[in-house]
Curated annotation (Swiss-Prot):
GO terms for biological process: translation. Coiled coil: none annotated. It comes from Pseudomonas savastanoi pv. phaseolicola (strain 1448A / Race 6). PANTHER family: 39S RIBOSOMAL PROTEIN L12, LARGE RIBOSOMAL SUBUNIT PROTEIN BL12M. InterPro entries: Ribosomal_bL12 (IPR000206), Ribosomal_bL12_C (IPR013823), Ribosomal_bL12_C/ClpS-like (IPR014719), Ribosomal_bL12_oligo (IPR008932), Ribosomal_bL12_oligo_N_sf (IPR036235). Keywords: Ribonucleoprotein, Ribosomal protein. One of its GO terms (cellular component) is cytosolic large ribosomal subunit. This is Large ribosomal subunit protein bL12. The gene is rplL. Homodimer. Part of the ribosomal stalk of the 50S ribosomal subunit. Forms a multimeric L10(L12)X complex, where L10 forms an elongated spine to which 2 to 4 L12 dimers bind in a sequential fashion. Binds GTP-bound translation factors. Pfam families: Ribosomal_L12, Ribosomal_L12_N.
Amino acid sequence: MSISQDDILNAVAEMSVLQVVELIKAFEEKFGVTAAAGSAGPAVAAAVVEEQTEFNVMLLEAGEKKVNVIKAVRELTGLGLKEAKAVVDGAPAMVLEAVAKDAADKAKATLEEAGAKVELK
């Protein structure tokens, strides 16, 4: 004869608080477990947001002052004239990859000052 889950729940519902406490202790001893509340491990881990430390500087478009943007790309990357022009002509294009936030912000400001539209990713 098998006892259903509903039968067990109804039996527990009819117990006094003292009887439920004794039942919990019996479960702990019999099965080697504790009735302590589980930790919210995954929820806590999801709440921790890592701050991005590396950024990519993406040239979206050169704008009206293409020559100034080419000069800025050369200054930031150390590329030659031909290579820098190819980057600017190929926009949207990656100018710098995996740089620190302050370096990425500085590069973005330099390129925007030259007339380019830039995005940090």
